[in-house]
């Protein structure tokens, strides 16, 4: 919980608060909360955390709406048609190529992300398509810290270290060692999340 790491963050930053509450509307807490949210978004975008993975289905349609917590597509095999063959669907990133694919649909299906939707070159059929994505929600159910009871989807020590080095940088204090420690811990946590020693 955020309330568990907050006293340590404040101590590292040299801020003395009895019974700190991240939701308090005082300058120090607003500043720490802002840096914490910047650090949390950075940590969540740099690693495909197992608890940030989501999926949804699109059935009998040429397009489907993206979830509200959508951040980006999963790295490998993000879209698969669910028929007997489990056909992978390739991404299309160019609007010009998409126009060509719409006019001359290839055998290999493609998808395009645009305007909060995912579009397919062919109808997904009754079996549908499974779409895997990475959620923007790095705090349980939301994408920002608001209270001491909030819980992150990644190790909270990363959030603490990421917040502290950013605070020191903002104040013009030496932060290189803290940032290097954060980066090493981040790599270790990412490997651990993937089950790699």
Segments predicted by a language model, with ranges:
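Glycine-enriched, solvent-exposed interface loops adjoining structured elements
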Residues: 1-197
